[in-house]
Each structure stands twice: as structure tokens, then as C-alpha cells.
Regions:
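Generic low-polarity alpha-helical segments
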Residues: 5, 44, 134-136, 150, ...
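Short helix/loop capping segments that flank catalytic or ligand/cofactor-binding pockets
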Residues: 13-17, 143-145, 158-161
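Glycine-rich, flexible loop/turn motifs
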Residues: 52, 56, 130, 139, ...
């Protein structure tokens, strides 16, 4: 089965070097952040649209994956085994990688087999929600365009299909 692990980030996390200092000031910094980490993943995957990947067991131990395990990656066109967690040079900011490393054992306690050593981490997915939020008032109407009711993921108010549906219902009401 496939699953995603989401690490929340805020505008103060948008610096491209992965540091958290609150220096983000441009509304498009979120887009720049996405592009930076997607480009890094492209490079780590070898530049041919293969995704960077690593076995969960190796990721937790801080070891490099050299061969696939019993769980084969489902991503097409394929996965290149690499070190997703090189300090300062990994596929995500160090704090995000640390959060994933901490969360995996907790997931395992709730879902047996979730973090089995041969499971494959494939990354990155940077688009769980819009990096921009279209501002809206208490009535859910856009503050800038009368008659526009921004809702869901594309408007920056949801991070998945369920929360987008809930937001859409709230806006419609």
C-alpha cells in the first residue's frame, strides 16, 4: 500500500537553505520553496525524472540504501536509491527529515508494518496544499474580488480531499 507522510511548514520555514529564521516576506516564497525542493529531488533522483528513494530501515539508522528490499517502489518512471537525509543537502530541510524520522516509530505503533525496514521512502511531494492563500472574509468571500468564494486546496484552505470537501461545504453554506 502507498501512504504519505506530511510535515507541516509555515511561511517562516520557506528559506531555501532549510533554516528557520522567519525571514520570508514575499507572498511567492512558498512557490520558490516548492521549486527548490522539487529541483533538489530531481537532482537526487539522477535528473531523469526518477524519484530519490531510501529504505525506511536505512533512513532510521542513518545508513545509505544500496539495494531494494522486499517492498518494490511503485513510482514510475522509477526510483534512484540515494541518501535522502544528507545534512544540508537532503531531499527536504533537516527539520522535516528529523520529524519524519521521529514519526515513523509512532506510526508503526498504530499501524503494524508501516515502518518495516524494507518499506520505501520516495520523495518529495511538495503539493499537499497551495503555497498561497487567497484571503477571504468571515463570509468566505474574497477580500479582493466581490462574488468570488475561494475554497479548498487551490485557494490555500485545505491539505487534502477530505479537508477540501469540508471547506467547500462551509463556503457553500
Amino acid at each position: 500500500a502507498n501512504a504519505g507522510i506530511v510535515v507541516g511548514i509555515d511561511p517562516q520555514d520557506y528559506r531555501q537553505d532549510g533554516q528557520r529564521d522567519g525571514s520570508a516576506v514575499n507572498p511567492l516564497d512558498g512557490v520558490a520553496c516548492q521549486r527548490f525542493w522539487e529541483s533538489r529531488a530531481f537532482e537526487l533522483g539522477g535528473g531523469g525524472y526518477q524519484a530519490p528513494g531510501r529504505l525506511v530501515g536505512d533512513f532510521i539508522k542513518g545508513q545509505r540504501s544500496t539495494v531494494l528490499g522486499s517492498v518494490l517502489p511503485s513510482y514510475q518512471p522509477g526510483v534512484t536509491l540515494t541518501d535522502l537525509a544528507q545534512p544540508g543537502r537532503g531531499s527536504l530541510p533537516d527539520y522535516a527529515l528529523a520529524a519524519i524520522r521521529e514519526a515513523l516509530p509512532a506510526f508503526e505503533r498504530q499501524i503494524k508494518g508501516f515502518s518495516m525496514p524494507d518499506a520505501m521512502l520516495t520523495g518529495v511531494e511538495t503539493r499537499t496544499s497551495s503555497p498561497l492563500r487567497i484571503t477571504r472574509g468571515r463570509d468566505h468571500q474574497s477580500l479582493n474580488v466581490k462574488g468570488l468564494y475561494p475554497a479548498g486546496e487551490g485557494a490555500g484552505y485545505a491539505g487534502g480531499i477530505m479537508s477540501a470537501g469540508v471547506d467547500g461545504i462551509e463556503v457553500a453554506e
